[in-house]
Amino acid sequence: MTTTALLTDRYELTMLDGLIAAGRHQQPSVFSTFARRLPRGRRYGVTAGTGRLVPMITDFRFDDETVDWLRADHVVSEETAQFLRGFRFSGDVEGYAEGEPYVAGAPLLTVRGPLGECILLETLVLSVLNHDSAIAAAAARMHCAARGRPLIEMGARRTHEQAGVDAARAAWLCGFDATSDLEAGLRHGIPTTGTAAHAFVLAFPTEADAFAAQLRTQGVGTTLLVDTYDIEQGIRSAVRVAGTDLGAIRIDSGPASEGARRARVLLDSLGATSTRIVLTGDLDEFVITELVDAPADAYGVGTQLSTGSGRPTAGLVYKLVETAGRPVAKSSEGKADPGGATRAWRRVVEGRAAEEIVLDGGRAPAGGPGELRPLTVPYLTGGEPAALPTLAGSREHHLRARGELPSDALLVAAGPEALPLLRG
């Protein structure tokens, strides 16, 4: 049996143990996942990872080997062990659609069900959503900064091997065009790309020999890496070997803007006017913004994408907001939360998002200008997964929803949150 049950913190199970002993584990409850505040400098977040999370919740089961280990390690009592042997999440999960932009306080994911079941999901929910939403927010900002120029995700080598796959998924969700990660291509259907690294060039007696070898296997449409030794000489060698129909060159070092300008002038002077310029090497949304007037044709982004561009977590929390029919909330300084289950709507006026409205779960907002769009979609009902959109469908949704945000909110500069949140 495939299980995700131990992708959790020990205290989730010790809390369950205490709830069972107190007879409270079946108490009807609601948990909400939200951000108390957005990461510094961010004006909106992007909901990501829910498509991965749903099957992980259905796989949150405890086989005999797992339960025996929990008993041997003195994590749970025998009574709790028996509960876990038959465990299957039976509640409801709803929330923002994958790819949906959000602001602080928005109920991204709501989990309803018996208290003991819901409490077990905390670590798994936060692990998936915090990582993927952080990557998605960075990717969305980079995509806006690129202004239509293709973006390649290249961050697998800068993070954990599985996180690299998930980062590629989140990046493609938010508009990236391809990934270097083959597992992401296989698992998620993302276009893959890649040609050669500096090691390939260094393996041959001369740069020209390396280019010729690459052309023999990849064809003239390939991208030649021209900065192993000297960029100008690399470009000249690339055109000499490949001819003026060479697909692209890649520059991975030096001042990006000036390097692209010099490369374009040189390529044009050599007759390679259609050869594209791909820039890589420590790019982020700020550098890409500065390159808006540079003659670059595409960007490859690695480290800054796979680490959330300096914001490696979305800062989401998973809090009990209702139990036994009454709202509950923390009130400690700096972490006071509104209690009660809620749902969200977005007001869109003349094609432009105007505000987020969050109300108690049973209420709908009053009328007003424009369209009131419900933001909550079902993910599981009675423990059974709902039909989920494809990743391509979620990508289309994200691009459409992001395009409705105020234009100044899409700039990389810090500023107020993209939308005001009204709570009632």
Kindly give the residue locations of the regions a language model identified.
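Ordered alpha/beta subdomains of enzyme catalytic regions
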Residues: 1-217, 320-424
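Glycine-rich phosphate/ribose-binding loops and adjacent secondary-structure elements
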Residues: 199-352
